[in-house]
């Protein structure tokens, strides 16, 4: 990075310094021992493997000073220090959770908050302000590639912006994360960056404007959306409670055009409810702030804010946020966004009304289920803000209007319902205001007059959520993230596939996007969670629990992602099911899901609000809402059609799913970029990482999922030169085996394979890179470290050997010196006393002076020699300096070229490396030489020493020079090679004149070929036109695009192979083409490419365009052009330093052009050779056209784009070649010099012919240019010919596609026809069903008529029973009571029930009075006429049986009426459903016809485009003809080409729009087809269900008719039996009178037993009733019944003993009665005994009476509970239906019980008659009956327990067993009637007991008065008969009233 960047204060937070990197990478590391181990607090900590563990799969790890034994699969590898704080985690050689966490932790500690992870950019919230978002930082990232700058949000944003401009593709940025992670802040920074970039592009056009700009408006949307959509949460003070997708539109030049916003998943519940520690939306607190004090008065906010319940449930203030300042920003943003003052005020008024509405109070009216307002102050304030009438508003809340049948009535609401309605209205109103705000912002940001060509979308949405309590909102948020993760996986898979395909890697691709498909289908597919939730919302009586049960039954054990939730732990809430997402298993609770999904509103309140006169905004936001009354009125006005809210019932899930589908469709059409925001800790503390929290977010955000995908492929990759440079040490010989880096890389890897260090599966070699599996790079790094250790060890040992050897040599020299010194010293000691030596010492100085001259001469000679050597060294130094200067210049040129091409090639970098090393060596050598020369000059006096030293230095210098010479030789060779290339180019330019002659000869042949090719091209274009016409048909079958993509990829790969093969073959044809034309063409192409780059960069476009214009003018005026070229060349020579970079680039491009020229020349030669075979090839093409009919539309579209790209490339090549022609001519220095020489010679020969000569030269140049143009046109013809061949192949494919897609279209048409026929059949079926319903109605009427007849028969039978009217009236009164009770359970209304209750009470009072009178009279009657009473009892039993039959028939009649009514209602519902289905079918047909008409319009548009294309083709043919004629000039061709390009672009744009429109229409057609299919299947399913129900109904009705017929027959028989019974009564009444006394005595004892039996039966009946009402209490009731039964049994035993005693006394009384006159004394004794027994019996009777009173009280309480249970009738009916499985079995048992009851009644009658003579036997029979009743009670209990057990198994069969329940009820009623008969008998027995008591006390004293008593009894009998007559009349009147 540049020094300027490093000076920025924010740079330290973006990238580490070099020193920090070295420090991080220098830590010790051992890949085999350093590991990560799990830690509870830190997540993972680093440890060192100490050794193997006690088991084979364990190791001992030392971490934190402790040894831990762990399993091997738990520990994770540590990455080498090279990857410490790496900027892209996908480069990690060990991709594991611990390494990812450590990398993020270490970078976050250094405040490097941005980190790449493959396609992700992970950002961690720093919890403090960092200077990394300033304008200076933004300018750093503008125009830079992602790899050039450190990770940053701006880098990703700029990449998206550049991709949009370069690839002409829409972009999207997906910013996700949990609340508080920084999504909103990053979104704002992204928007500001795009606004800055777009504005910078626009500034040049609109400089100096003062008005509000679009950039300002885009930025100002944030305060508005944050005020209404953000709130304080526990984690975040400014949390966005909604998701948004912001699309920023640009034009083709990158200028900001407009912006629009879409929002998702607004948290509506926050406006009425806030959790502790949280706050409502900011706007409520802002309007209450002090920014506009008068605003509070205007909004009637007179109370403290803490008094407003809706906004004051938790926090009121936020630390660090000033609501006054924020409100100022919000209000100013409203102004910037062009909100009018009225709109602002209306919006504030609605917010104030919301606060007032939360304080409205209501109370419950006494004794009514109706709420009423508790004060109207707050309601008046709210209505004042709404602009509506307060009375209407309150009435709409407490009494909304609902539709019942066909009428509208007011429904009373209780307090809870009113409060719930207020909350629902508050949520709905706020959501609509927020939607209006977004809509208004979009209207403001929609700028007119600027093209909206592309957009960049920014998605800010909540990330995955796994809470302790997960509800409806979490399901949808997680579903959205599931879809986004699938989108990312698929996108990453596509990029990996493209990368591997581009590099030629063979790999089996895995679409990881399919991994999440199962979970997504579980949620959104039919019978999925959302589908079943929507279904439950329309099912009557559905609850959240039924939804949970259905989900469990449908998916548990059947779907892998649906699980049973585990029990809650800790703070976890209850869950009903669990689902496995990619981020983990989530436990969901379904409470309130139905209400949240339906989100109902009070239509009456909405109608009141829509009528507001003072608040226009309120009217506007409710304008699109249609209430039920409005829909009914509209339907009535439109012909009786029914409708609901907006014509259909839309649940929240439906709306969410629709918006989500739109979002995913939009994202799939863009190039995505991913930003993942992370919360580091819950404490909001900067610099601290909570490992568990971060790992959970990485999982939820999909970062770890992305790493998992990386592991499956080859995540690590390295460029070939980099790989060779770094790992050449592993195979030095192989690294130098070739100049091709790819070959060297392959050789190195092969050497490692031979060494058994790697295998073939661990890597792949691509065209430019080497790809490695995860962990392989670390292994190779270890091998490199080992190799370096070996080399360094060997090097150190060699140095040690050298130093030791040198030391030994020095020591030997020292030893020799010592020896010499010692020898000389010894010699001196010997000579010092020698006389001759002394003489020598005296003469020696004189001899030395004499020889000084000789020494000086010698030294002078040596000096000369040294000076000569020094001069040589100096000259060598200068030559080295010159070489150094040359190398420096060459280096600067190469560096400039390298900088210009932005990266250069690996070969140039290697050359630069070698040149730099050579330069350094040369510099070092020069410095050494300079030092040595200076030393020679300074130390000239000591030449002897300097000479030795100089010699040594010269030797060293020679060695250095030799090394430098070697390097220079290499550099000179390379330079010579480049110069040779330049010379060859110049030679080629010199050979132009020679080639022109050859071209003239070939011109005619080429022209002939050209004409032939033009004809062929026209034929092919005709085929192309045919293909275009067929394209309109092909565009109707776009649904096969995905399969076509795969085939296209394979074909594309084959095409690329064939293309490379053809390109290799074309290289041999280079020598047959004009070299200058080819160079010109290729140079023009390179210049065109350069112009595109300059256009993208926007820096040098004006200079290049001026240069192009100058060159165009020079082509027209050749002489002036030559002069200008000379001036420009001179200028170029003067500014050579500035043009070196461009020249180097042109030189490189020229080399590339030469290669491409070779290829195209070979292509032309092959094309010319193939022209002779053109006819046969055309035949082959036609045959191929027939063979390739099965291709699809997607392939056609891609081929079309490819053709367009090729045409565009050819056009661009033409322009570029024409422009580069001028530059090439500037390089023709030799020609220009020759031209100068010729002009000079002409001037010297004759000045008069200068002008003529110049003109002649000009003509020659024009001829040459024309010839060049001809050559160029010839080349273009060749290219067009080759293009034509390719187009022929493409057209063949297109034709094959046409035929295939026509077949598919025919299939679709047939399918459509089938669908139409199915619709017709469905309509016919509906009509048939309607006809069947009409028949059913007729049958129902017949049944009703039959029932009326039954009623008449019943009335006749009732009227015919005058003789038994007393019993009949009693039974009818009981029937009326049970009927009232039955109706009170839900079949009649409360008012009718009260009316019936009053009537029944009156009847009961009358009956009680009559009963009292009758009892008083019957007492005396029974004394005298016992016989009559006995016969009456017999007749009563017969009447009871017949009345039971009559009651059964009446109940059957009522049940049948109810069944008929139910089926009528069902038939009406079915008719409604069929009508709705018919309407839907009509609507679908209408939409299909509309789509067909739109498709026809599109076809017409396509036909128009085809005609335009044909015109375009005709123009191309005209241009080709003009080219062959050579008559156009360069400027005309240039203009034509540009015009054609523009037309082509317009045509292509029109075609793209048409294709897009057609795709949209096709998708609509497909959706409609799916909907039609669903509707058809649903209709068939419903028809099948209704047919089954109708069949069951017919069967049940048939059974009912048979039962009624049988009942009628039985009733006729009963009537005959009654007549016979009447006669029998008349004959038997006298006999019964005689046996009265004995019966009374026997009945005294029997009554006791019967009373106990009555108590037991009554207990059983009470238990049955309680079981029906409260199933949960049945066990307790039965336990109580068992206790009472035990008591009854004990009492029964006591009574048995007492009866035995009384039997004895009775026998004695009989004997005494026979001998009454003779044994009076004995009777008195017996009378005393009877008196004692009487007292006992009286006590027992008193006890029984008390018990009877208790039971009567219980009966009254039961009746009270029955009245209260009227509201629970529906639930009881539901519970009854659940008992239907055993209904048949219970019916049989109860029939048998009924039979037993009848038998019991007969036995009782027999016992009554037999008691006269056989009292003891009667008592025994009573005991037997008691035992049988006990057994029946136990059996009934067991059967009821079995019914309870079968309850849970029979819910699903409730509907099927509906009619069986009715039969069960009837049987139960019969049983109840039997119980009532027993009760009546007990009453009679009670009276008989009283009479028996009187007889027992007075039988002796009043024996003589019997005759008088009989007379009195006769009188009372007459009175009783009159009473019976009166009672019979009452019964008749009551029956008539019924």
Curated annotation (Swiss-Prot):
Tissue expression per record: Found exclusively in the pharyngeal muscle.
Subcellular location: Cytoplasm, Myofibril
Keyword Coiled coil annotated: yes
Main location: cytoplasm
Single GO cellular component term: myosin II complex
Biased composition, class Basic and acidic residues, residue ranges: 16-27, 920-951
Notes on the domains: The rodlike tail sequence is highly repetitive, showing cycles of a 28-residue repeat pattern composed of 4 heptapeptides, characteristic for alpha-helical coiled coils.
Subunit description: Muscle myosin is a hexameric protein that consists of 2 heavy chain subunits (MHC), 2 alkali light chain subunits (MLC) and 2 regulatory light chain subunits (MLC-2). Interacts with itr-1 (via c-terminal coiled coil domain).
Additional comment: There are four different myosin heavy chains in C.elegans.
Its biological purpose: Muscle contraction.
Name used for this protein in its record: Myosin-1
Source species of the chain: Caenorhabditis elegans
């Amino acid at each position: 990075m540049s020094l300027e960047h490093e000076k920025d204060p924010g740079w330290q937070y973006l990238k580490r310094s070099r020193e920090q990197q070295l420090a991080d990478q220098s830590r010790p590391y051992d890949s085999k021992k350093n590991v990560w181990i799990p830690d509870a607090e830190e997540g993972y900590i680093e440890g060192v493997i100490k050794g193997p563990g006690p088991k084979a799969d364990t190791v001992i790890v030392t971490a934190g000073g402790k040894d831990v034994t762990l399993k091997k699969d738990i520990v994770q590898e540590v990455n080498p220090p090279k990857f410490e704080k790496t900027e892209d985690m996908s480069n990690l050689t060990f991709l594991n959770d611990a390494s990812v966490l450590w990398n993020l932790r270490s970078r976050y500690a250094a405040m490097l908050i941005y980190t790449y992870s493959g396609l992700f950019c992970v950002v961690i919230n720093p919890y403090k302000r960092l200077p990394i978002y300033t304008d200076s930082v933004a300018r750093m990232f503008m125009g830079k590639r992602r790899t050039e700058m450190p990770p940053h949000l701006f880098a990703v944003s700029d990449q998206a912006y550049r991709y949009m401009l370069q690839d002409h593709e829409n972009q999207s940025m997906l910013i996700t994360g949990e609340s508080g992670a920084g999504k909103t802040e990053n979104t704002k920074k992204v928007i500001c960056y795009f606004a800055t970039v777009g504005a910078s592009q626009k500034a040049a056009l609109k400089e100096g404007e003062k008005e509000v700009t679009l950039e300002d408006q885009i930025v100002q949307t944030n305060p508005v959306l944050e005020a209404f959509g953000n709130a304080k949460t526990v984690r975040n003070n400014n949390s966005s409670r909604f998701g948004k997708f912001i699309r920023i539109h640009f034009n083709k030049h990158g200028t900001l055009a407009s912006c629009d916003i879409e929002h998702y998943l607004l948290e509506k519940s926050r406006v009425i409810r806030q959790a502790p520690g949280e706050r409502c939306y900011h706007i409520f607190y802002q309007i209450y702030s002090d920014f506009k004090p008068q605003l509070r008065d205007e909004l009637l906010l007179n109370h403290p804010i803490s008094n407003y319940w809706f906004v004051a449930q938790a926090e009121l203030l936020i630390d660090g946020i000033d609501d006054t300042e924020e409100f100022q920003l919000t209000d100013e943003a409203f102004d910037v966004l062009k909100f009018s003052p009225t709109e602002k005020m209306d919006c504030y008024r609605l917010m104030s009304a919301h606060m007032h509405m939360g304080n409205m109070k209501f109370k419950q009216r006494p004794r009514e289920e109706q709420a009423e307002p508790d004060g109207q102050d707050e309601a008046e304030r709210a209505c004042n803000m709404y602009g509506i009438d307060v009375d209407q508003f309150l009435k709409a809340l407490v009494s909304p209007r609902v539709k019942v049948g066909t009428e509208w009535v007011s429904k009373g609401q209780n307090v809870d319902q009113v409060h719930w309605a207020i909350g629902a209205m508050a949520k709905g109103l706020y959501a609509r205001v927020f939607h209006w705000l977004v809509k208004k912002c979009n209207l403001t940001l929609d700028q007119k007059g600027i093209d909206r060509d592309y957009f960049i979308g920014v998605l800010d949405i909540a990330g995955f959520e796994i809470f302790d309590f997960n509800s409806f909102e979490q399901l949808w948020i997680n579903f959205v993230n599931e879809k986004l993760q699938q989108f990312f996986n698929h996108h990453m898979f596509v990029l990996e596939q493209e990368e591997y395909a581009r590099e030629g890697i063979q790999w089996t691709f895995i679409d990881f996007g399919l991994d999440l498909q199962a979970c997504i289908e579980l949620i959104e597919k039919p019978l999925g969670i959302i589908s079943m939730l929507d279904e439950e919302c329309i099912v009557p009586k559905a609850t959240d629990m039924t939804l949970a049960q259905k989900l469990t039954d449908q998916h548990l054990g059947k779907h892998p992602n649906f699980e049973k939730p585990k029990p809650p732990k800790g703070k976890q809430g209850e869950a009903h099911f669990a689902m496995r997402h990619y981020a983990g298993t989530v436990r969901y609770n379904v409470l309130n899901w139905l209400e949240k999904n339906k989100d109902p509103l009070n239509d009456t309140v909405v109608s009141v609000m829509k009528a507001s006169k003072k608040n226009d905004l309120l009217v506007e936001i409710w304008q699109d809402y249609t209430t039920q009354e409005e829909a009914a009125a509209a339907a009535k006005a439109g012909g009786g059609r029914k409708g609901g809210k907006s014509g259909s019932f839309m649940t929240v899930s439906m709306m969410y799913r629709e918006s989500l589908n739109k979002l995913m469709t939009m994202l799939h059409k863009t190039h995505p970029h991913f930003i993942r925001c992370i919360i580091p800790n819950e404490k909001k503390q900067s610099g601290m990482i909570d490992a568990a929290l971060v790992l959970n977010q990485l999982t939820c955000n999909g970062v770890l999922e992305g790493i998992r995908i990386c592991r499956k492929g080859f995540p690590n990759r390295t460029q070939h030169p980099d790989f060779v440079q770094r790992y050449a040490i592993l195979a030095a010989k192989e690294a130098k085996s070739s100049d091709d880096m790819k070959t060297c890389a392959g050789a190195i890897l092969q050497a490692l394979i031979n060494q058994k260090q790697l295998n073939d599966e661990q890597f792949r070699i691509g065209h430019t890179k080497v790809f490695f599996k995860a962990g392989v790079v670390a292994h190779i790094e270890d091998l490199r470290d080992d190799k370096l250790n070996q080399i360094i060890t060997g090097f150190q040992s060699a140095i040690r050997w050298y130093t030791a050897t040198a030391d030994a040599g020095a020591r030997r020299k020292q030893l020799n010196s010592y020896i010499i010194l010692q020898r000389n010293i010894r010699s001196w000691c010997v000579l010092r006393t020698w006389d001759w030596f002394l003489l020598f010492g005296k003469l020696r100085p004189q001899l030395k002076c004499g020889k000084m001259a000789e020494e000086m001469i010698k030294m002078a000679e040596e000096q000369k020699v040294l000076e000569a050597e020094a001069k040589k060294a100096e000259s060598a130094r200068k030559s080295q300096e010159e070489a150094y200067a040359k190398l420096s210049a060459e280096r600067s040129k190469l560096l400039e070229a390298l900088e210009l091409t932005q990266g250069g090639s690996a070969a140039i970098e290697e050359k630069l490396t070698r040149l730099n090393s050579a330069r350094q060596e040369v510099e070092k050598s020069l410095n050494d030489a300079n030092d040595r020369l200076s030393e020679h000059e300074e130390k000239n006096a000591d030449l002897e020493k300097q000479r030795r030293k100089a010699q040594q230095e010269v030797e060293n210098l020679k060695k250095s020079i030799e090394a430098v010479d070697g390097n220079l030789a290499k550099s000179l060779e390379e330079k010579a090679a480049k110069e040779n290339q330049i010379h060859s180019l110049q030679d080629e330019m010199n050979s132009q004149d020679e080639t022109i002659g050859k071209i003239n000869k070939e011109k005619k042949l080429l022209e002939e070929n050209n004409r032939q090719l033009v004809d062929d091209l026209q034929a092919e274009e005709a085929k192309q036109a045919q293909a275009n016409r067929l394209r309109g048909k092909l565009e109707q079958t776009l649904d096969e695009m995905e399969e076509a993509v795969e085939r296209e990829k394979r074909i594309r790969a084959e095409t690329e192979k064939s293309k490379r093969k053809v390109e290799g073959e074309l290289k041999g044809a280079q020598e047959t083409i004009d070299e200058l034309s080819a160079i010109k063409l290729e140079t023009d192409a390179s210049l065109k490419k350069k112009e595109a780059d300059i256009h993208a960069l926007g820096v040098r476009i004006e200079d290049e365009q001026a240069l192009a214009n100058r060159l165009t003018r020079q082509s027209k005026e050749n002489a002036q052009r030559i002069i200008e070229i000379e001036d420009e060349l001179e200028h170029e020579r003067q500014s050579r330093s500035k043009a070196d970079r461009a020249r180097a680039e042109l030189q490189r491009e020229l080399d590339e052009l030469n290669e491409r020229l070779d290829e195209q020349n070979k292509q032309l030669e092959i094309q010319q050779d193939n022209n002779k075979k053109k006819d046969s090839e055309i035949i082959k093409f036609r045959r191929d056209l027939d063979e390739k009919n099965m291709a699809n539309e997607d392939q056609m579209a891609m081929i079309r784009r490819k053709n367009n790209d090729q045409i565009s490339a050819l056009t661009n090549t033409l322009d570029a070649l024409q422009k580069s022609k001028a530059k090439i001519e500037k390089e023709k220095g030799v020609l220009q010099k020759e031209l100068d020489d010729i002009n000079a010679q002409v001037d010297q020969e004759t000045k008069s012919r200068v002008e003529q000569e110049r003109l002649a030269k000009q003509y020659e140049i024009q001829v040459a240019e024309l010839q060049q143009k001809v050559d160029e046109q010839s080349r273009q013809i060749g290219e067009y010919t080759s293009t034509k061949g390719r187009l022929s192949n493409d057209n063949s494919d297109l034709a094959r596609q046409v035929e295939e897609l026509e077949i598919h279209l025919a299939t679709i048409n047939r399918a459509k026809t089938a669908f139409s026929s199915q619709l017709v059949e469905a309509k016919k079926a509906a009509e048939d069903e309607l006809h069947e319903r009409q028949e059913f109605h007729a049958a129902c009427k017949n049944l009703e008529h039959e029932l009326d007849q039954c009623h008449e028969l019943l009335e006749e039978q009732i009227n015919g029973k005058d003789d038994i009217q007393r019993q009949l009236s009693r039974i009818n009164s009981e029937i009326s009571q049970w009927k009232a009770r039955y109706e009170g359970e839900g079949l009649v209304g409360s008012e009718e029930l009260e009316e019936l209750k009053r009537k029944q009470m009156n009847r009961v009072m009358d009956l009680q009075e009559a009963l009292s009178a009758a009892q008083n009279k019957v007492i005396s009657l029974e004394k005298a006429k016992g016989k009559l009473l006995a016969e009456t009892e017999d007749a009563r039993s017969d009447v009871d049986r017949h009345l039971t039959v009559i009651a059964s028939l009446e109940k059957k009649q009522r049940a049948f009426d109810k069944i008929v009514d139910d089926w009528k209602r069902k038939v009406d519902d079915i008719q409604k459903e069929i009508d709705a289905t018919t309407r839907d079918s009509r609507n679908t047909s209408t939409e299909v016809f509309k789509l067909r008409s739109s498709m026809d319009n599109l076809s017409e548009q396509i036909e128009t485009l085809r005609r335009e294309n044909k015109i375009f083709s005709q123009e191309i043919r005209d241009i080709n003809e003009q080219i062959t004629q050579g008559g156009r000039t360069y400027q005309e061709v240039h203009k034509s080409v540009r015009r054609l390009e523009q037309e082509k672009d317009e045509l292509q744009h029109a075609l793209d729009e048409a294709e897009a429109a057609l795709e949209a229409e096709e998708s609509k057609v497909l959706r409609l087809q799916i909907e039609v299919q669903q509707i058809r299947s649903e209709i068939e399913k419903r028809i099948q269900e209704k047919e089954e129900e109708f069949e069951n109904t017919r069967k049940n009705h048939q059974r009912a008719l048979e039962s009624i017929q049988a009942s009628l027959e039985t009733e006729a028989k009963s009537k005959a039996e009654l007549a016979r019974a009447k006669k029998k009564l008349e004959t038997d009444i006298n006999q019964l009178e005689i046996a009265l006394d004995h019966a009374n005595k026997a009945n005294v004892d029997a009554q006791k037993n019967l009373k106990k039996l009555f108590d037991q039966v009554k207990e059983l009946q009470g238990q049955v009733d309680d079981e029906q009402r409260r199933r949960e209490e049945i066990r307790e009731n039965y336990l109580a019944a068992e206790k009472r039964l035990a008591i009854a049994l004990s009492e029964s035993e006591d009574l048995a003993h007492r009866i035995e005693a009384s039997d004895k006394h009775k026998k004695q009384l009989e004997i005494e009665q026979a001998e009454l006159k003779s044994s009076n004394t004995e009777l008195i004794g017996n009378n005393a005994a009877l008196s004692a027994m009487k007292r006992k019996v009286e006590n027992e009777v008193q006890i029984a009476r008390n018990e009877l009173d208790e039971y009567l009280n219980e009966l009254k309480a039961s009746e009270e509970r029955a009245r209260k249970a009227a509201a629970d009738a529906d639930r009881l009916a539901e519970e009854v239906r659940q008992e239907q499985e055993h209904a048949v079995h219970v019916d049989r048992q109860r029939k048998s019980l009924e039979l037993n009851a009848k038998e019991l009644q007969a036995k009782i009658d027999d016992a009554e008659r037999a008691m006269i003579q056989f009292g003891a036997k009667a008592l025994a029979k009573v005991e037997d009956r008691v035992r049988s009743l006990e057994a029946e009670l136990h059996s009934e209990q067991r059967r009821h327990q079995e019914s309870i057990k079968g309850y849970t198994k029979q819910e699903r069969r409730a509907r099927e067993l509906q009619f069986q329940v009715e039969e069960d009820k009837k049987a139960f009623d019969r049983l109840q009637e039997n119980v009532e008969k027993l009760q009546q008998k007990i009453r009679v027995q009670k009276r008989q007991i009283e009479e028996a008591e009187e007889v027992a006390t007075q039988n002796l004293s009043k024996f003589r008065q019997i005759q008088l008593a009989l007379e009195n009894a006769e009188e009372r009998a007459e009175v009783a008969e009159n009473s019976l007559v009166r009672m019979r009349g009452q019964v008749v009147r009551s029956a008539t009233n019924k």
